[in-house]
């Protein structure tokens, strides 16, 4: 089975001393993928996203705000989200890598394509960045895949400990996008209740399963097994994109869920099986949160193992 790792050291220019969203996160996750796949891993070069594709999601005025902040030597979009010289190029690489991963998986070039990038993206909305995020990488990738005729009905799986408020807001009225999320609640950003099910024509395509602090593998796995994976199956997507955050891990310093590597492997296995059942070419992932380096490495490795095992269970003979 083919695995792609899409990562680029150019994203490391986006850094602020003492900030938890730091460059060595990328290295830890990339090492986790390499641990599992070894010499058979493909690492194609990353191509930065073009502005036209970014503007399918983000307002041009917001992009100008980012560019202006860089030109002034940097600044803060909110108390959590910084811009420094090099941040805009890092965001372009992050979105570009996520689009490459999405295309590789949707076309069958890779069974698993993991964009190991930063800054993360799922809190970024059309006109603002927040929660460490500048561009909404998964949203831009989805729009780019559609624009290139690669996929039309797309499911977004989000297991970050924080609800992906930006992603949900962008697609909640779109009936051709299914958004499924587990996240800690109550917690930042304060959205993601079970009653948030989409709006307008998109009612019924948003699925939130908030988990209380202290929840571990049992609750995490059950939410996906019993509710979210069946909802995605009923939606019948022709591509799956995963917002892979690992801050629900029990060792993460910024949250209070108790998920382990085994929990991520189990849920990834379900997604792998589902992708094979649907006849999809593969599964694409993009890095979101996660701030303990050892947990990041182990969880990324567990995710890739789970996805490959799930896909093999249906695509390879005994």
Task: Provide a role label for each language-model segment.
Residues 1-318:
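HDAC/HDAC-like amidohydrolase catalytic core signature
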């Amino acid at each position: 089975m083919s695995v792609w790792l899409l990562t680029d050291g150019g994203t490391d220019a986006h850094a602020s001393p003492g900030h938890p969203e730091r460059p060595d996160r990328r290295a830890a996750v990339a090492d986790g993928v390499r641990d599992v796949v070894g010499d058979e891993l493909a690492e194609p070069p990353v191509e930065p996203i073009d502005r036209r594709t970014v503007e399918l999601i983000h307002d041009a005025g917001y992009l100008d705000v980012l560019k202006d902040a860089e030109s002034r030597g940097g600044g803060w979009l909110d108390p959590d989200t910084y811009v420094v010289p090099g941040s805009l190029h890092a965001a372009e690489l992050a979105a570009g890598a996520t689009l490459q991963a999405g295309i590789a998986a949707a076309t069958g070039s890779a069974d698993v394509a993991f964009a190991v990038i930063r800054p993360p993206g799922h809190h970024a909305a059309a006109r603002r960045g927040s929660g460490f995020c500048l561009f909404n990488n998964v949203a831009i990738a989805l729009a780019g895949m559609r624009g290139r005729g690669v996929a039309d009905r797309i499911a977004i799986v989000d297991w970050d400990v924080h609800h992906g408020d930006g992603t949900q807001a962008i697609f909640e009225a779109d009936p051709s996008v299914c958004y499924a999320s587990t996240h800690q609640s109550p917690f930042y950003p304060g959205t993601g209740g079970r009653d948030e099910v989409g709006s307008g024509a998109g009612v019924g395509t948003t699925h939130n399963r908030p988990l209380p602090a202290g929840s571990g593998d049992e609750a995490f796995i059950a939410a996906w097994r019993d509710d979210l994976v069946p909802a995605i199956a009923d939606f019948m997507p022709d591509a799956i994109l995963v917002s892979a955050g690992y801050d629900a891990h029990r060792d993460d310093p910024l949250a209070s869920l108790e998920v382990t590597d085994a929990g991520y492997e189990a849920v990834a296995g379900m997604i792998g099986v589902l992708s094979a059942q649907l006849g999809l070419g593969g599964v694409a992932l993009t890095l979101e949160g996660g701030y303990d380096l050892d947990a990041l490495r182990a969880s990324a490795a567990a995710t890739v193992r789970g996805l490959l095992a799930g896909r093999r269970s249906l695509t390879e003979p005994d």
